[in-house]
């Protein structure tokens, strides 16, 4: 993260279907930067949280409602259709594995995001899930292969090695941009904004810690 980005490298985009912020950024990037060389990488958000000893935003009670309201507001501002699912958090593994099994194409990612965040449906709704599988020409057995599971695990290991701690995160070279709030910053970097070669930008990653909070 402390190195200048490589403007010619593809943008690795780490995401999990569990994240409403990933859904929102996916649509923003498609609309605002259709020529961006985006390389989507599905990862299990819970594994990132466990590795970095962190909590997701909806695991903090006062933050939970705010998170959903904020997402709805962002969707409204950007003209993105959004409907909260029947429950959240939920188990995203079937969605992640289905995306990998079907080649992780933009069309597949679009449809799976829409299933949850446009239509408000979940993988644990058996009838709805079967309809989705039928629509995509997929079978439950495709989600359960060793190859699919190994790919998802490898994606997570790759994300952690890159320093990814949350979703969505975009990597432009070694520079990481976390969250839908960083979309404008990401696009500026990808466009070669000189800020990302500045001494002040570099200093942000070398700032000393003055005080460490004690944890019980």
Name the predicted role of every residue range.
Residues 21-116, 200-216:
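Structural alpha/beta surface segment adjacent to cysteine/selenocysteine redox centers
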């Amino acid at each position: 993260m402390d190195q200048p980005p490589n403007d010619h490298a593809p943008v690795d985009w780490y995401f999990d279907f569990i994240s409403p912020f990933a859904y929102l950024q996916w649509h923003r990037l498609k609309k605002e930067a259709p020529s961006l060389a985006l390389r989507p990488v599905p990862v299990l958000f819970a594994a990132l949280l466990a590795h970095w000893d962190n909590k997701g935003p909806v695991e903090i009670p006062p933050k939970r409602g705010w998170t959903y309201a904020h997402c709805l507001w962002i969707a409204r501002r950007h003209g993105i259709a959004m409907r909260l699912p029947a429950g959240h958090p939920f188990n995203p593994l079937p969605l992640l594995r289905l995306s990998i099994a079907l080649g992780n194409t933009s069309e597949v990612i679009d449809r799976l995001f829409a299933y949850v965040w446009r239509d408000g449906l979940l993988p644990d709704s058996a009838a709805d899930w079967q309809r989705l599988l039928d629509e995509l020409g997929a079978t439950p057995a495709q989600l359960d292969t060793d190859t699919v599971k190994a790919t998802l695990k490898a994606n997570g290991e790759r994300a952690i090695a890159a320093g990814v701690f949350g979703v969505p995160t975009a990597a432009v070279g070694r520079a990481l941009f976390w969250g839908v709030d960083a979309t404008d910053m990401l696009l500026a970097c990808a466009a070669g904004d000189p800020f990302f070669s500045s001494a002040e930008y570099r200093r942000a990653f070398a700032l000393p810690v003055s005080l460490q909070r004690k944890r019980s």
